[in-house]
């Protein structure tokens, strides 16, 4: 069974620093792929991904 990264992390007792370079390098291609699959493509929209702090609301304890 294949899981996405966030589901995998939530099932484990680990955390990821969303400000780390590793996470930003991982997040950018994923967010870019998700945005290309939208129904509407606004030409005036900025193509940069949202910052991970705003896009990911995963709270790990």
From Swiss-Prot:
Protein name per the record: Putative MSV199 domain-containing protein 200R
Domain of life: Viruses
């Amino acid at each position: 069974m294949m899981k996405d990264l966030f589901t995998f992390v939530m099932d484990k007792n680990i955390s990821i620093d969303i400000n780390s370079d590793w996470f930003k390098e991982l997040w950018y291609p994923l967010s870019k792929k998700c945005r290309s699959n939208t129904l509407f493509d606004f030409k005036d929209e900025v193509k940069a991904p949202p910052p991970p702090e705003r896009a990911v609301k995963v709270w790990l304890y």
